[in-house]
């Protein structure tokens, strides 16, 4: 991987562009879920003919995008998924040219925490979160002993994060294992 650009050398969209938030957003909470291998064209809430997202469709204030990945590997997709189009170099390593949206949100006054069922530590570190924990850390916590190490362990992490940051602008990023092989061994039939 070409990692020749340091974070201080990256374009900072927060400095180049202006965003003025509407009044009344002092206490704003954003939960951002990175859902692995979920295709927008198979989600009922985004127009798929079958109702594949009945619970998500009922959520208030939910925003879903018809996004596409720039690559098939998580490591490379994470590089370009959270920057503007053209924010990475067109090379095999997808070298970043600008800061990702999460680093920009931090500059705009958001606190943030990231919890993941994967181990892309290089990416989590570049988010500039106040705290992050990944699969091996979360799964080894005493409170999780005897539990299946699956995406559902992210729910109590999210709740605890919201409790730790009860006021202000706060972002919680959840990186799921999603539909990666072998789905049937990671989720109960009831799911």
Roles of regions detected by a PLM:
Residues 1-32, 37-191:
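Active-site-proximal alpha/beta segments of enzymes that process anionic O-linked groups
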């Amino acid at each position: 991987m070409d990692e020749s650009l340091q974070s201080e050398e990256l374009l900072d969209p927060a400095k180049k562009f202006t965003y003025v938030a509407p009044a009344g957003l002092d206490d704003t909470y954003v939960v951002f879920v990175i859902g692995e291998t979920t295709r927008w064209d198979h989600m009922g809430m985004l127009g798929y003919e079958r109702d594949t997202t009945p619970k998500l469709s009922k959520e208030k204030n939910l925003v879903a995008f018809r996004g596409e990945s720039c690559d098939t590997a998580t490591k490379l997709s994470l590089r370009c998924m959270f920057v503007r189009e053209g924010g990475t170099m067109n090379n095999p390593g997808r070298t970043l040219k600008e800061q990702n949206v999460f680093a920009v949100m931090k500059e705009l006054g958001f606190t943030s925490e990231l919890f993941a069922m994967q181990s892309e530590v290089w990416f989590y570190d570049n988010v500039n979160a106040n705290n992050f924990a990944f699969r091996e850390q979360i799964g080894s916590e005493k409170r999780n002993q005897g539990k299946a190490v699956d995406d559902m362990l992210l729910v109590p992490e999210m709740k605890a994060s919201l409790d730790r940051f009860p006021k202000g602008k706060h972002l919680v990023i959840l990186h799921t294992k999603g539909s990666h092989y072998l789905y049937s061994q990671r989720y109960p039939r009831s799911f």
